Amino acid sequence: MKLKITKLVPIIAIGVQMSHYSIAASTETSSWDNVTTPLIAGVGHENHRGAAWCDYDNDGFLDLYMAHFGAFDPDGLYLGSPNQLLKNLGDTEFEDVTTLELEANSGLSHHPAWADIDNDGLLDLFVSQSSNNGTEHSILLRQDSIGVFSDITDGEPLQLGGLLPRGIGWQDINNDGLIDLLVAVSNGDAMQNRMLINLGGGSFIRQSSLFSDEYKEGRSIGWCDYNNDNLPDVYIANGAEDHCDVSERTNQLFKNLGDGVWEEVASEAGVAETGHARGHVWGDINNDGHMDLFVGNQKGSDTGGGFNRLFENNGDGTFTDITVSAGMYASFRTRCVSMADYDNDGFLDIYIVNFGGALPPNHLFRNNGDNTFTEVAIGSPAVGGSFNGAAASWADYDNDGWVDLYLVGGSINAPGIGQNQLLRNTNQNGNHWLEVELCGTESNRSAIGARVTIKHIKSGQGLVTQMRDIQSGTGYNSQNMLRAHFGIGSSTTIINMTIRWPSGVVQSIGGILPDQIIRVVEDEDTFAFDCNRNCVSDLVDIAEGLSQDTNGNAIPDECECITDADADINGDGSVNVIDLLIIISNWDAEGSSEGDIDGDGIVGIQDLLLLIGAWSDC
């Protein structure tokens, strides 16, 4: 049976726009709407630190968790500020649904990251938090039912009490189907990172021999299979200050040799950067099938920054520093770096978040497709301007196929400086796109660590191959949406899509139409779509009677938003103006004419009323 691929949720019409900027630098144009409201900005919360997109309630709309660090008290200590969970209402508005547990006010928050730790279909949340007095700690919140969270931190090893945990990254390192957690630590206990193994039932144990032998100041974690051997590797950015020994800020790349054996290979791979790293990000910038690496650096003054580094993956386990030739060689004071294809042309672009008392601007670089980048907007409000940034997270929050950008400000200065911003992407240039959401069955339910690869024919380029990883933590104190987003330019058909799951299962399908969001369930035998989001194949739902398929198109009725299948005269999944025109063209016709919804032998007023009652133009 041929499957028809359907949108996960309908495309949303966008409402009121607060402000609009269209910026040109050289010949480049970038267009964004600043749709920030006081709620989204985090007004009333001081010194923001991180943000994580998720769909905690499984309604198909991406929600936002904001981590706040706090402000100084009269004694010079930071006071924690309650974190917030904002529910996406689906109409470009958000609602604060924060509960006492979600405030996570047990410490000074850094990095939030979502993952389904118990594979129950509900995302859970870990927030790394530091302490002023040694009693505050990090927190793990399990989602017991939609919107109901329990604190299951329950002491060590999860609390990380007395430490300064920074970046975190979820990954199933032992391939048991349970997601594990690596935490970068930048102080205390010999500054050793923490590898926490998920035992199930909400319990974790520290595996002390992994990623913690050397004294480093860990800042960010990035899991990625950089050598394409189907084993997850990890890069750790270490960011000590000038007064510290250079060895404490040498970044690390741990190569996974299998069977629980790891080898630190940063020097031989050419990525042992020592420039006060904060954030880093993996991505295939040139679509050659190898993941490249961008590292953001900073120095301890507002006037001079570390040079960020762009490393091209050579495909043989080594990297080449192409920072200069790529046009990325500039001195910034960078906290967060990120990649996304904001213009849907098929190439990953780079966004840089800078910070400091001098309020250096953020920067957006457009990928030219030839291993070079062009700066789109210099210090422009369209990309966040100058606001002492802390983090940046990408997500298609309005489900229109164009990734939007949430910026986290880190200032405790005057009101309005350093407030968070939500920038809606309005760079609609006619390019096509595809978004893929995954649900693991043998693998961890969140599908973190999965790799999605697509192939399509693009005019002037021939066969193009693109790949995206599902990542839990990226950049610095950030989590992008757990969807794979592809811009495909002018291509109108995706010839093939392959999903390589963490379990080793590989799924493949051909002939996918663009401009839609699809959800796929891990399955060895079939490419299983999951439009109703229950992590069961639509075909299984229909076969077992869990869903109805009135028109026999292999799509559950609840996914077609029609209440009367007979009113969908042309069978396209919607009752709309096309069906109305069919009725009009056959008005008063007798016999078995198209448009006779009630089956009384004539097309007339009763059929029109039935059509109006079932109207669902979606």
Regions found by a protein language model. Give the residues of each.
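Cellulosome-associated attachment modules in secreted, modular CAZymes
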Residues: 529-618
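Hydrophobic beta-strand segments that make up the repeating blades of beta-propeller
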Residues: 64-69, 125-130, 181-186, 234-239, ...
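Calcium-coordinating acidic loop motifs
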Residues: 54-61, 89-90, 115-122, 144-145, ...
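Gly/Ser/Thr/Pro-enriched helix-cap/hinge segments flanking short amphipathic alpha-helices
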Residues: 40, 378-389, 393, 397-528
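Repeat-based blade/solenoid architectures
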Residues: 39-52, 100-113, 156-169, 210-222, ...
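An edge-strand/N-cap motif at the start of beta-rich repeat modules
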Residues: 25-46, 51-53, 62-64, 78, ...
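Short consensus segments that form the blades of beta-propeller domains
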Residues: 42, 72-78, 129-132, 185-187, ...
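Beta-propeller blade repeat segments, especially FG-GAP/WD-type strand-to-loop junctions
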Residues: 24-34, 73-97, 135-152, 190-207, ...
